[in-house]
Regions:
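Extracytoplasmic beta-rich repeat domains
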Residues: 61, 90-110, 138-156, 182-199, ...
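Structural signature of WD-repeat beta-propellers
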Residues: 71, 120-121, 150, 159, ...
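C-terminal motif of bacterial Sec signal peptides marking the signal peptidase cleavage site
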Residues: 18-20
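Bacterial signal peptide processing site
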Residues: 22-25
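WD40 beta-propeller blade core
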Residues: 126, 172, 212, 257, ...
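Short loop/turn segments that connect beta-strands within beta-propeller blades
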Residues: 129-133, 175-179, 215-219, 261-264, ...
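Blade/loop signatures of beta-propeller domains
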Residues: 30-48, 53-90, 266
Length: 439
């Protein structure tokens, strides 16, 4: 194939001519797609021919005021938040130290009714107005951690507390109104996941595949549960999921446990491991994407190439699909949107896991030399658009109904954490530590 077909455009889709930008209104940064050409890349996953003619239908977008956990709520399920059809940059602010080779930015912001909370790679917590980005307070936790930074962890907020986990193994519970440390505990083991707040308890998952439940007010250990320890894992970790008194925890070993939220006893368990010798990256059974609960069904994806749906109460497998990835699936109504490890954005039926459509995203900055792999993060469904962020500075929107490319902007800085949305505003945190608000 001639060089004419190799290009440095924003997003490659497999089946569609690119249309004019329909999401972002910042004209100075809009990507001009009028000269773009589609590179004919074959997708790994194929649409199921039995679903030809099936129309994707979504519930009406609803304004959500908060994003309290790293993936909005303890069930990791928000359905369809509202944003305007066209959004533009409302404000931008630097929240602290950006990432370096040792310390990537992995923690998404969390948002309550009035404020947005962030953490940088030096464990500085910032509380800002979600309306205009004005800083309300800052708190440096650096004296409590080692000098190399936090290396994973994350944030969660409720009506009273802001909970912070750090990669160095320390959990902090802060007064969210002023940043005062109410209590902290050193677990002496790396924490790679954000905390999950459920009622009066907080769930903490550590690198050694141990889940602990603590009382938020009394700093009391409620219970612990342990899975098999795994040597080969990805940076970061999935977070527990909670619904109807059941805690779902997925370990890097591929194990899935349903636990009683009150005492940690096992209700049922499963395993996504392929039971093969792990000699390559593709064989790692690590579950990095968060398990999602919707309508008493559980959806889990592993890197090794398995995505499954289970009955929440019994653990019975309802279906499985040969799709692997590290991003959290977005489940809404009867459909699932997921970004695979092959940079394919896929729409599946939540009933049987059959593929409805597939769109290929660009893999490399330089396709001919296959250099500089692009990491895509997402998707985020908002305002009838699927939003994905690229490590090359491109934020793109794709139709959830067809997989067609809608538009993109170049923010000229890598985004490697999941975008969040609250009160008609989409927030992006760049690797340089800049928080961008689009509304």
């Amino acid at each position: 194939m001639s060089k004419f077909f190799y290009f440095l455009t924003v997003v490659i889709t497999t089946f569609f001519l690119l249309t004019s930008c329909g999401l972002f209104k910042d004209k100075e940064k809009d990507i001009d797609t009028s000269d773009s050409r589609v590179f004919p890349v074959e997708t790994v996953v194929k649409p199921d021919q039995s679903l030809r003619g099936i129309k994707v239908s979504l519930p009406k977008p609803v304004i959500n005021k908060t994003w309290m956990q790293s993936t909005n709520n303890e069930a990791h399920n928000i359905q369809h938040p509202f944003v305007n059809n066209k959004i533009r940059l409302a404000w931008k602010i630097n929240i602290g130290k950006g990432q370096n080779k040792k310390n990537p930015i992995t923690s998404q912001p969390v948002i309550d009714e009035t404020n947005i909370y962030t953490i940088d790679t030096k464990a500085k917590i910032v509380s800002l107005s979600k309306v205009n980005g004005k800083i309300k307070w800052e708190k440096k936790l650096r004296k409590k951690i080692d000098r190399d930074g936090i290396l994973n962890g994350g944030l969660a907020v409720n009506e009273k507390y802001l909970v912070v986990t750090t990669g160095t193994g320390i959990v902090f519970v802060l007064d969210k109104e002023n940043g005062k440390i109410l209590w902290d505990i050193d677990l002496s083991i790396t924490i790679r996941a954000a905390p999950i707040i459920s009622g009066n308890s907080v769930l903490i998952l550590t690198k050694d595949n141990r889940l602990s439940s603590y009382d938020l007010q009394e700093k009391k250990l409620n219970w612990t549960h342990e899975g098999l320890e795994e040597i080969s894992t990805f940076m970061g970790s999935s977070m527990p999921t909670v619904s109807n008194g059941i805690v779902i925890v997925t370990y890097s070993s591929g194990e899935i446990y349903a636990l009683n939220e009150l005492n940690g006893s096992v209700i049922w368990n499963d395993n996504l491991s392929l039971y093969i010798q792990k000699q390559s990256l593709d064989n790692i059974s690590d579950i990095r994407g968060n398990p999602v609960i919707n309508d008493n069904k559980l959806y889990v994806i592993s890197y090794s190439g398995k995505m499954i749906s289970l009955d929440l109460n019994s653990g019975i497998r309802l279906w499985e699909s040969n799709i692997g990835g590290i991003q959290t699936p977005w489940v809404v109504s009867r459909f699932i949107f997921v970004l695979s490890k092959d940079n394919e954005l896929i729409c599946l039926s939540s009933k049987d896991g059959k593929v409805i459509w597939v769109s290929k995203l660009k893999d490399f900055m330089d396709f001919e030399k296959k250099e500089k792999n692009i990491l895509w993060t997402g998707p985020l469904l908002a305002g009838r658009m699927l939003i994905v962020s690229g490590s090359h500075g491109i934020i793109a929107s794709i139709s959830p109904y067809s997989g067609k490319f809608l538009g993109a902007i170049n923010i000229k800085s890598s985004v490697e954490t999941h975008a969040v949305v609250a009160d008609r505003t989409v927030f992006f945190l760049t690797v340089g530590g800049d928080l961008l608000a689009y509304r």
